[in-house]
Design a protein with these regions (language model features):
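Charged DNA-binding/catalytic regions of mobile-element recombinases
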Residues: 1-295
Length: 295
């Protein structure tokens, strides 16, 4: 009996064991309860209270499609129509996105790399293509600049850096964090815009040191780095616009919480089948392991 065997494997993560045996976690939980259902159907008042609680907890980042999946993940299945109705009737909405603004300076005489990525935003495996960009964040103490490195495979932020000035250090620090975290093999493609920070000799030396291939967007074409710019739009929409940060330390703490706690590990991503980046990667790795065992 698969469920009885799973019950003995306490040293391994439950989700991984269930995935290897092709059974659902919910099915295993039901077996533990003797086949009894987990919860009765919630009333509209109870469901609304739960939706409002999640909306407040996640600071309004989810519309109805993601809310349906979040409820399901928490053990409260509900139809898309029901969640849409409750959110509409009670004016519960996701925060609206704003247009992206360019922050890097591409007016320089430094060498420019060709656009090798060419908008191929769906690599077949992790650590094949990383993309980078910089954005600005205002606090009462002054500006902060955030540089990120994003793995296109699972949209995970693998490296990031916050500094009060937009110098070359900000992008090299983000790249260094990403490299030490993932240790990718030589040949990884790194894509960015033509900003002077990315074209600088220091950053190009860092790429060469890590065995990475440089790719840059075409002049004035934001769509060549669309996934990274989209991430900044979501980040600012969900954590910056309409909010006040008194100190740089407060902004830094918020950025850490958003990237490392919420986005990478919890936030559903529509292009990943409404999984978080790390969950998507974990599921992919489990699938790879199963295929190796079969082979």
């Amino acid at each position: 009996m698969k469920y009885a065997w799973i019950d003995k494997q306490r040293e391994f993560p439950l989700t991984e064991v269930c995935a290897i045996l092709d059974v659902s976690v919910s099915g295993y939980r039901s077996w533990q309860r003797g086949g009894r259902p987990n919860r009765k159907r919630l009333t509209d008042i109870q469901m609304l209270a739960l939706i409002q609680s999640i909306h407040a907890e996640l600071k309004g980042i989810y519309g109805s499609p993601r809310m349906v999946r979040e409820l399901r993940d928490r053990g409260f299945p509900a139809s898309k129509e029901r969640v849409e109705r409750l959110m509409r009737e009670n004016d519960i909405r996701a925060r609206h996105k704003r247009r992206y603004k360019v922050t890097t300076d591409s007016k320089h005489n430094l060498p420019i790399a060709p656009n090798l990525l060419d908008r191929n935003f769906n690599p077949a495996a992790p650590n094949q293509v990383w993309t980078s960009d910089i954005t600005y964040l205002w606090t009462d103490e002054g500006w902060l600049y955030l540089a990120i490195v994003l793995d296109l495979f699972n949209r995970e932020i693998v490296g990031w850096s916050l500094k009060p000035r937009m110098t070359t250090d900000i992008v090299t620090d983000a790249l260094t964090m990403a490299w030490f975290r993932k240790r990718p093999a030589a040949g990884l493609m790194h894509h960015s815009d033509r900003g002077s920070q990315y074209a600088s000799h220091a950053f190009q030396r860092a790429l060469e040191k890590y065995g990475m291939i440089c790719s840059m967007s075409r002049k004035g074409n934001c769509w060549d780095n669309a996934p990274t710019e989209s991430w900044f739009n979501s980040f600012k929409n969900e954590r910056v616009h309409g909010l006040r940060y008194e100190t740089r330390a407060e902004m830094t703490a918020m950025s850490f919480e958003y990237i490392e706690v919420l986005y990478n590990r919890k936030r559903q991503h529509s292009s990943l089948g409404y999984k978080s980046p790390i969950r998507f990667l974990d599921d992919w790795l489990i699938t790879q392991q199963k295929e190796k065992l079969v082979a």
